[in-house]
Regions:
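Short active-site-adjacent structural elements
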Residues: 152, 183-188
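Hydrophobic, aromatic-enriched interface-forming segments
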Residues: 153-158
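An accessory alpha-helical subdomain
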Residues: 171-184
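N-terminal catalytic or cofactor-binding beta/alpha core of small enzyme domains
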Residues: 2-147, 160-165, 171, 189-221
Length: 221
């Protein structure tokens, strides 16, 4: 998996430890991707002394990891149409199995994200603390046990593999949140302002919780 140079005007490196917040460009024929609209809305805000830096990723296999800011924390956002809540991903798996082509026309099937890499990585952000923070902000939220097998999972696994190699700053953490459709894109949906508020709350929780909390958020199947 090849790191990609930042490709938006919001991606100039900032002084001090940053929070890197990424979203995707539109894919699958959609006009907008709410993941990028959320990241763009939070760009420049300060959270507990860390400045949020937004960067847009292309929905393309093998080119979807931005790592230019030496961030203390990286949170990647992606669209999961059909979900009704912000979905904090627990795990990324080492497989690409694309149901549709990416924006470059590639459709890998049963290929590894990282050849020779482990089967999976857990997100290193405090997902339960983030869940509680988002819910307390009044925004629907859940812990998800699968990030799929498309580009979102590819990015989550790739990010965690990069952090595991020790090339990021010591103590750097990362994770992924899937977001629903916007109003007018499909059902179920959430208003953009609610999703922005929820991700803002998730970032605060991630920064302020060096260790996760015990909170029931599992599934039976």
């Amino acid at each position: 998996m090849t790191p990609m140079a930042p490709d938006t005007l919001h991606s100039a490196p900032q002084a001090g430890p940053a929070i890197l917040l990424t979203g995707f460009d539109p894919f699958g024929g959609g006009a907008h991707n709410p993941s990028w609209l959320i990241a763009e809305a939070l760009h420049g805000q300060r959270i507990a002394g860390h400045q949020v830096v937004a960067a847009q990723l292309p929905t393309v296999f093998g080119q979807s990891l931005v790592q230019a800011h030496q961030p203390a924390l990286t949170l990647c956002l992606g669209l999961a149409g059909g979900r009704a809540a912000l979905s904090i991903e627990r795990i990324g798996i080492n497989i690409n199995d694309a149901r549709i082509p990416d924006n470059a026309g590639a459709q890998p099937i049963d290929t590894p994200v990282q050849s020779g890499g482990p089967a999976a990585y857990f997100a290193s952000l405090p997902i339960k603390a983030m869940l509680r923070g988002v819910q307390r902000a009044g925004v629907p939220c859940e812990v998800s046990q699968t990030a799929g097998t498309f580009v979102c999972n590819h990015v989550l696994y790739g990010l965690m593999h990069l952090l595991a190699q020790g090339t990021a700053p010591q103590g750097a953490r990362g994770g992924f949140v899937h977001v629903p459709w916007l109003s007018g894109q499909g059902e179920p949906h959430l208003p953009l302002r609610d999703m922005v508020r929820g991700i803002h709350a998730a970032l605060w929780a991630a920064v302020l919780a060096p260790q996760d909390i015990a909170l029931q958020a599992g599934d039976t199947h």
